[in-house]
Amino acid sequence: MDMKNITDTLNDFSDGVNPFPVEWISEHPDKVEDVLAKLSTEDQIRYAMQLRGSLMHDFINLSPNSQEVIRGLPPEELYQMIKETGIGESLPILAMMSQNQLQYSFDLEWWQRDCFVPECALKWLEFIDACDDSSIVQWLQNEDFDQKVVLFQSLIKVYKDDEMTDSYEGVEEMEHLCLDGVYDVFFKTKEPGALRRLITLLRSEDPSLYTSILEAVIWYPVTQTIETAYRWRLIRTAERGIPDFKEAMEVYSYPSPEALKIPATKLEDFSYQGGFNIAPHYPLMQTESVPFLKDVVLRLGNSPRLNTISWELVYLANKIMVADQVQPSDLETRKESLKKVLGYINIGLELGASGDLEKGARLLSHTHVLPLFQTGYQQLMTLKWKTESFLKENGSFLERLFTELDKDLLAALVVRFPRVAEVGDKKALGWRHFSSIKDVRNAESFIDQWIFHLRFARKGLGLSERTIKQYLGKCDIHENHEMMDLTNWTAMAFAHYILFKKISCAPLSEPSAKSFLEIVFLLGVFKEEVRQCDSALVDSFKQELLKLPLAWIDSDQNFLATLLNKCVVHLQQEFGRIDLKAEVDWKFTHGLCIVKNPTSL
């Protein structure tokens, strides 16, 4: 199979339909309308799902049967589009959503775990207020009664002029509404315009429901009603692959060998009320960050398995958000959770397929993505536990050797979900989830490197917490002793070897430090150029270190070479431009531990 991109593969879902260049949506909307008029609703839905955010939104609005297209989309895909576009920009979409699609959005937006959030509910009501009335009326007439009561109890107070309900407590300065001379409605919000119109609309369209809700606001016990509404919410979300916390946490259990033998899912296994059983596309659109998984998916081609993989990814990302106790209504959280899912699956798939794409395609074609995710997760937990054990045994001494970057890199490996560093657009260090075996191997190598560094510092350089504290106590040039890390202590050992033919990290006098730099640096051609260290002297020092009784293995020698290279680069950057014939102001340098008084050595 020729390699292409994910969008090309998703195009195959529409039997090759790719009706116009994407640029036409903004540049030639009239041409898009003409093309869409000739396409079936199903093809329009499939093509819409290959787009993201505002492009998808604009495409749908150009369709002559946009309501059918909207209601044919899975609620997950539609909700993702609204989050990417912004709810304020999605009013035409909201106006045409079905009751089930609206409810899916409400279930994610109005609740934070088991807590109802009236501010979020009111925000959505205000946006829906700007749309057609029919959608919200349909929702009010069909949705679970307890949820409607919870909504109104959180936003209004209701009293009647009778002996049982005429207390009118705590309504001072609240806006008031009375539509029938019976129920006095007081608004808890400062700007109740949308809520006022909703109540007025409800009484106009369904007086019986209006009365039932206001009576329930008066009489239903708040706590029990919230609990009942939450139970119904859990039932609805469970049907869409969003389980309760206990079930969601099972995704982080140890993968069982039997799980790999469970047959792959079928489309019928996923809940969907639309007329076109089309899987969401947005998870597969994110696989650019996981090349191995992406290439495996491309090898699957246009197959039913691709549909079920998409659903599995959606359901798994939802479970992850529940298990991690994060808010699924936050767009960045949704992106992060999906990246984690894809990354862990990619690691598990790479391991299971031994890096072979064809083997990976065979594995993914009949294996649920969950055990692959769990395999990737366990790899990271093994890495985390190894790091924690290493830090627990050696933490206080390591603090004396780490750079700030080393501390950050190791700290990122012991958080709840280990992270890997990456350089952003502005060359600032950022953190992301592990996404490949290469990431894991690099992190393992980093830990192994520090295991060697620790052994080298203790047995090779003769350092301990006591000796470092003793040396720093004599070093009266640097105020910030934390700036002395393993690279600097290695430079000190290099200096002692060049000057005295011994391995030591004891502080140097100013004349000794100057003599070392005069010896180790080659003469420069130009005055302003950075002078280079004499590679012959560096190699001689390396050979001397290799004589140390450290039970050297190949990786140790590689780690030593890297450490010496860092040492040389640091010396050149810090001292390579200094005029050693003049007096050196050592307090503006960093890298050598120096004392002013030679008698203190």
Sequence positions of predicted segments:
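General marker for long, soluble alpha-helical cores
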Residues: 2-96, 100-601
